[in-house]
Amino acid sequence: MTALTTEARLELVDAFTGLGYKVYTAVPNVPTAKSIVIIPDTPWITPSRIGSTLNYEVFWKVIVTVSPRNNDAAQLDSENAVDTILAAIPNPYTFTRVGPPQLTDVGAQGTVITTEINVSVRMKEN
């Protein structure tokens, strides 16, 4: 049996695959520009169990990275990435917040621009 959290994460991976971004299902050592990183949000799981069936809402951070090449192009790339990803979020997932683009240092590899999208979905055991 696959965990409900795993099912939820993999549904997002499937939705984002083919959009032109490298999709990471866990935190990479070094995120590349033009990628999507899916990680647990806080809270990660909010239970709502009634009876014996497992039932909860799971929350994810979808972090989009783009190259910081120059300010104008990076801003446009971030805006286009957000629109593309929001359109690809499947039903019944909801997005609750989109953070502003920000420079993120990734060590010796330099910096990337990251934008955080918060999504959630209710999962129920069959």
Where are these regions (language model features)?
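Charged, amphipathic alpha-helical segments and their flanking helix caps
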Residues: 1-31, 42-126
